[in-house]
């Protein structure tokens, strides 16, 4: 092992924070995940910022925000340009996760960290890969990586990173070896004793229920809630584990014996329709049983979800009658529909809340999990029923704030109208005839638009199917200074567009096939006219939280509210992560040479560390870093990269050995090639010394030659000039201060930058005598062929190698699998093939 391997931990070690690690393999830097949580702390991004120009690739393991939530920020605000690698489902579902996150925050606050455009720009850098597809890192480093199924979420990956020399680095966090309804479990069969294992200890010390018992408990709690005429909210993520629960509940609703078909099943998020649509097209990433055909021999897609209602807003949810079961995002309940529904439903004792995961301890969901574990069959204790929560929401403007908003909006509208009218006036002037004698052409009259027509004018101006018969002002600016009898664009202007073609024919523009599907009655100030909204026939209507900004102005408010929890609160684990006992056995079975434990609380990390030490692993093989810690995972304590000089390569004499390989002795010494920075510093110091000597010499000569009177006059002039430029020097003093400080530092005390280490050839007098070595296992038959090539007569006779008709012989006896020399007659004139002792192996 000769590679330099280091791991820098930025977040996600001995805590429940987002995951972000920087792996260094020689000169390549690979970023392993870049998550973010609801706290949106910028600390670890600032620590990561200096390394961003060095990053060669980013590997994303799972689509949830804890693994890729910080990617848009790194691309938009930190300047990340390296390619991002993930599987196809992680790419699609990751976008859904981040979209839902941004929409949820825009519903209650002004989200400033990144926008939807930043999300799109970040995912444009993603290169999608498949399982078991080997991707070679760009450059000549020889580093490649492969995604292996993790079994936790659709498309979730464990990454195997290899060098060309064959050393493996395994990065596996949040994996599941058990088979789910829609996913197959992970497998470690393809991993053979890696050099470094980077793994997580997330919830490794917590017990887990069996799948059958867990499903029965879920159905029981749902039935108890809906039969009491209550609504049941199941808190789940946006596009990951929600597929498992949606598929399970859809099957239960389809089963008439379950007794759930009379109630409504709802999946609620800002991107619910898109999540289901993507799931339909990603069956190849799921378990093989989902490819089976139904009884009608037609292809059956299990994620059609016929019994699930997809909603994207509260208005759509209200239209669905109660009792109902709602799969609601987000999982930590810090924002999103899950928090809003909890605030609305917690006061009714008929309702129920089922939590399916243990998020970070600072979240509302984590507090409710603790209360549920202390509760009696979902009913909280009296001392646990009251919580003080921060409530954030958007409210419409009222009173003075609304008047101020209308005043500013009127000013903006007036300015926009003035600009449009000025543009129209210039276009009208451009259409006037250059020929003053032509009375048939009248200048077009542009009527002044009233305040009521402003919105209609915008609709016409923005419509892609409307054309202005007046020539554009920009075209008229290119006309000649002299009058021309030829009119530019006398009638309807027409510019023929070049039709684009591809392999399938003419490229279709979707906007050419839009239809007017509905009339949106949006009432502004004194505007009752309808606004035409264009919509594609196959386009689904997705809730956009910014739509209400056009209807009425709003503002974000927040306040503390003390709530009473009367509903049932229960916890059923559906995280899809391997249990602790199985995780320990699988990781120990890999027999890695070094282990780095990340992504887990201090107790979980300590538990996994103790298991490894009790099962034969040495303490120097285990590392449990904390945030902002650098781990050196190289085998040798000191590794340096050395280059071969051209002079050494010219003197090397290679000898061919078996299987096309070549070997050579290298007799050289290690020298440090001075870096360019040191050469520049040395050159600057030399120039500084020479300049100072020249200045001193000039001053001495001038003092010897110049008379005293002239010197006194020059001194007076110099004092006067110094007074005149005093102000200028004062203004430039700040900028010169740094240069003076830098120049005042002695050159010798400045740090020396290490240069490149190279191997240079030794003088021939210093080259030692090399002893003979044997490469591989020599065979007696090969030695016979060598003698024949040298002109000797050699043949086998009863286990004896006869040379030159018996004049020189070697008596060989076979003992087990060895050839042992029993006796040997020396002979002369054998040249380079003479030897005094031989040991041949079969």
UniProtKB/Swiss-Prot annotation:
Keyword Transit peptide among UniProt keywords: no
Gene3D superfamilies xrefs: Ribonuclease Z/Hydroxyacylglutathione hydrolase-like (3.60.15.10)
Keywords of the record: mRNA processing, Nucleus, RNA-binding
Record GO terms (molecular function): RNA binding
CDD domains from the UniProt entry: CPSF2-like_MBL-fold
Sequence ranges of Polar residues compositional bias: 731-747
Compartments where found: Nucleus
GO biological process, one term: mRNA 3'-end processing by stem-loop binding and cleavage
GO annotation, cellular component aspect: mRNA cleavage and polyadenylation specificity factor complex
Compositionally biased intervals (Basic and acidic residues): 414-425
Comp. bias regions, Acidic residues: 432-441
Stretches the record annotates as Disordered: 414-442, 708-747
Entry's family note: Belongs to the metallo-beta-lactamase superfamily. RNA-metabolizing metallo-beta-lactamase-like family. CPSF2/YSH1 subfamily.
Role summary: CPSF plays a key role in pre-mRNA 3'-end formation, recognizing the AAUAAA signal sequence and interacting with poly(A)polymerase and other factors to bring about cleavage and poly(A) addition.
Subunit organization: CPSF is a heterotetramer composed of four distinct subunits 160, 100, 70 and 30 kDa.
Protein name per UniProt: Probable cleavage and polyadenylation specificity factor subunit 2
Organism: Caenorhabditis briggsae
Gene from which the chain derives: cpsf-2
């Amino acid at each position: 092992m000769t590679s330099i391997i280091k791991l820098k931990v930025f977040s996600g070690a001995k805590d429940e924070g987002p995951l972000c690690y920087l792996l260094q393999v020689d000169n390549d830097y690979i970023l392993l995940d870049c998550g973010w949580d609801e706290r949106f702390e910028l600390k670890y991004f600032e620590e990561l910022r200096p390394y961003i120009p060095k990053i060669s690739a980013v590997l994303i393991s799972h689509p949830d925000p804890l693994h890729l939530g910080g990617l848009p920020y790194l691309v938009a605000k930190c300047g990340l340009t390296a390619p991002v690698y993930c599987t196809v489902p992680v790419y699609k579902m990751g976008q859904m996760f981040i979209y839902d996150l941004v929409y949820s925050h825009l519903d209650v606050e002004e989200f400033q960290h990144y926008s939807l455009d930043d999300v799109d720009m970040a995912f444009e850098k993603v290169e999608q890969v498949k399982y078991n597809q080997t991707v070679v890192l760009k450059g000549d480093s020889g580093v490649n990586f492969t995604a292996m199924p993790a079994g936790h979420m659709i498309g979730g990956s464990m990454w195997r990173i290899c060098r060309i020399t064959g050393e493996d680095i395994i990065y596996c966090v949040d994996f599941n070896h058990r088979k789910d309804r829609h996913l197959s479990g992970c497998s470690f069969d393809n991993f053979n004793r890696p050099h470094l294992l980077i793994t997580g200890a997330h919830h490794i010390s917590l017990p887990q229920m069996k799948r059958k018992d867990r499903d029965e408990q879920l159905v029981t709690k749902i039935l108890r809630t809906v039969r009491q005429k209550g609504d049941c909210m199941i808190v789940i993520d946006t596009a990951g584990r929600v597929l498992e629960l949606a598929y399970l509940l859809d099957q239960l609703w389809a089963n008439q014996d379950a007794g759930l078909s009379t109630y409504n099943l709802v999946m609620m998020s800002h991107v619910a329709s898109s999540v289901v649509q993507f799931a339909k097209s990603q069956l190849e990433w799921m378990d093989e049983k989902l490819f089976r055909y139904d009884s009608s021999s037609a292809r059956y897609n299990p994620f059609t979800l016929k019994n699930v209602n997809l909603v994207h807003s509260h208005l759509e949810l209200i239209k669905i009658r109660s009792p109902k079961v709602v799969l609601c995002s987000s999982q930590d309940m810090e924002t999103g529909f899950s928090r809003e529904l909890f605030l609305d439903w917690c006061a009714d004792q008929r309702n129920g809340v089922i939590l399916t995961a243990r998020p970070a301890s600072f979240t509302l969901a984590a507090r409710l999990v603790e209360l549920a574990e202390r509760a009696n069959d979902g009913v909280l204790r009296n001392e646990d029923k009251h919580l003080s929560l921060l409530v954030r929401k958007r409210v419409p403007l009222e009173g003075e704030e609304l008047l101020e908003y209308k005043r500013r909006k009127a000013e903006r509208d007036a300015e926009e109208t003035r600009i449009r009218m000025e543009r129209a006036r210039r276009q009208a002037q451009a259409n006037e005839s250059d020929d003053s004698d032509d009375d048939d052409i009248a200048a077009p009259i542009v009527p002044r638009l009233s305040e009521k027509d402003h919105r209609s004018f915008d609709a016409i101006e923005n419509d892609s199917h409307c054309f202005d018969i007046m020539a554009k002002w920009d075209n008229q600016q290119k006309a000649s200074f002299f009058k021309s009898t030829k009119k530019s664009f006398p009638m309807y202007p027409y510019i023929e567009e070049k039709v684009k073609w591809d392999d399938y024919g003419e490229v279709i523009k979707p906007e050419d096939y839009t239809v007017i599907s509905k009339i949106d009655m949006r009432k502004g100030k004194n505007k009752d006219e309808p606004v035409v909204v264009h919509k594609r026939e196959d386009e689904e209507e997705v809730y956009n939280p910014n739509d209400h900004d056009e209807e009425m102005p709003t503002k974000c408010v927040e306040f503390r509210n003390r709530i009473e929890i009367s509903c049932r609160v229960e916890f059923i684990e559906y995280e899809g992560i391997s249990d602790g006992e199985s995780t320990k056995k699988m990781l120990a079975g890999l027999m890695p040479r070094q282990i780095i434990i990340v992504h887990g609380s201090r107790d979980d990390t300590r538990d996994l560390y103790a298991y490894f030490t009790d099962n034969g692993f040495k303490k120097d093989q285990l590392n449990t870093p904390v945030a902002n810690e650098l781990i050196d995972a190289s085998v040798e304590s000191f590794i340096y990269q050395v280059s071969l000089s051209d002079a050494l390569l010219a003197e090397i004499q290679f000898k061919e050995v078996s299987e096309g390989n070549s070997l050579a002795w290298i007799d050289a010494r290690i020298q440090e090639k001075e870096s360019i920075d040191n050469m520049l510093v040395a050159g600057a110091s030399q120039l500084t010394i020479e300049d100072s000597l020249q200045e001193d010499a000039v001053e001495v000569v001038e003092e010897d030659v110049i008379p005293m009177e002239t010197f006194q006059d020059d001194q007076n002039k110099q004092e006067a000039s110094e007074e005149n430029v005093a102000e200028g020097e004062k203004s430039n003093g700040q900028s010169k201060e740094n240069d003076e400080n830098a120049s005042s530092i002695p050159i010798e005390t400045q740090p020396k930058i290490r240069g490149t280490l190279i191997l240079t050839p030794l003088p021939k007098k210093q080259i030692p005598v090399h002893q003979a070595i044997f490469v591989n296992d020599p065979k007696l038959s090969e030695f016979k062929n060598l003698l024949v090539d040298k002109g000797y007569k050699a043949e086998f006779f009863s286990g004896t190698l006869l040379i030159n008709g018996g004049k020189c012989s070697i008596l060989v006896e076979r003992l087990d699998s060895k050839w042992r020399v029993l006796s040997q007659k020396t002979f002369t004139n054998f040249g380079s093939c003479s030897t005094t002792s031989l040991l041949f192996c079969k």
